[in-house]
């Protein structure tokens, strides 16, 4: 029985990354789940489009989404649980400037969201890909949601 404890403990330790945070004279250890894959989405110039417009990832994958804003306007990336909520989220975003135009009062309707990326800035968000289906990712900066969106396809 003791032979199994060491390999299992080692496997669990290998699946978790740790970050160290200095807090005065002591160090605090934070466990973080390992990232399975990194996806890069970009915005360029003055066009209100994400590139690529479609992504496919296996459900349950832990993703680091890196958004590179090479555009001339600020943008964010928001993944709602349902495309039916996008219009309401976009309206609520107008009053959410303090939170990067992400309506945090509606946080339960969101799978993931980035901070606001100024032109030339790169931001990241980490999330677990939801159950199989199609999910829309959208920019909720005022006036962008009608044309700046893409599709995240969650695969089995």
List PLM regions with ranges.
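Beta-strand cores of secreted/periplasmic/IMS beta-sandwich domains, seen most often
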Residues: 54-79, 123-131, 135-136, 153-154
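N-terminal edge beta-strand
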Residues: 33-62
């Amino acid at each position: 029985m003791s032979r199994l404890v060491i390999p299992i403990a080692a496997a669990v330790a290998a699946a978790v990354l740790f970050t160290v945070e200095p807090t005065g004279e002591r160090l605090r250890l934070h466990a973080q789940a390992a990232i399975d894959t990194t996806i890069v989405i970009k915005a360029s110039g003055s066009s209100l489009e994400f590139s690529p417009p479609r992504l496919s990832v296996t459900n349950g994958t832990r993703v680091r989404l890196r958004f590179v804003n090479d555009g001339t306007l600020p943008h964010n990336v928001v993944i709602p649980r349902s495309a039916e909520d996008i219009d309401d989220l976009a309206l609520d975003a107008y009053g959410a400037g303090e939170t990067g135009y992400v309506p945090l009062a509606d946080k339960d309707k969101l799978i993931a969201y980035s901070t606001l990326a100024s032109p030339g800035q790169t931001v990241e968000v980490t999330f677990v890909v939801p159950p199989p289906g199609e999910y829309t990712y959208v920019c909720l900066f005022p006036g962008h949601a009608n044309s700046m969106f893409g599709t995240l396809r969650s695969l089995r």
